[in-house]
UniProtKB/Swiss-Prot annotation:
Disulfide bond sites: 34-58, 35-74
Record family assignment: Belongs to the intercrine beta (chemokine CC) family.
GO molecular function: CCR chemokine receptor binding; chemokine activity
InterPro entries: Chemokine_b/g/d, Chemokine_CC_CS, Chemokine_IL8-like_dom, Interleukin_8-like_sf
Signal peptide boundaries: 1-23
A cellular-component GO term for this protein: extracellular region
Lineage, opening ranks: Eukaryota, Metazoa, Chordata, Craniata, Vertebrata
Alphabetic keyword roster: Chemotaxis, Cytokine, Disulfide bond, Secreted, Signal
Name this protein carries in UniProt: C-C motif chemokine 3-like 1
Site (Cleavage): 25-26
Length: 93
């Protein structure tokens, strides 16, 4: 009786651990940042330190500018000023 109780306890613990591992999202499949709206005005270019594009899994394609103060600003990639900033950042890299 004691052996079957111990075996059952081990089995339940193993199932609980496996369930947590299987239910955890995979890092590569989870977008790190998505934008749901864009900035309504152009940011001064000298405020921008870097940029990255959002994942294709996001509902809205976006460029996220990183400011020198550490803020993230969502911008519309179809805007001319956004394309110019991205191009300038690529050239300076």
């Amino acid at each position: 009786m004691q052996v079957s109780t111990a075996a059952l306890a081990v089995l339940l613990c193993t199932m609980a651990l496996c369930n947590q591992v299987l239910s955890a999202p995979l890092a590569a499949d989870t977008p790190t940042a998505c934008c749901f709206s864009y900035t309504s005005r152009q940011i001064p270019q000298n405020f921008i330190a870097d940029y990255f594009e959002t994942s294709s899994q996001c509902s809205k394609p976006s460029v996220i500018f990183l400011t020198k103060r550490g803020r993230q600003v969502c911008a519309d990639p179809s805007e001319e000023w956004v394309q110019k900033y991205v191009s300038d950042l690529e050239l300076s890299a």
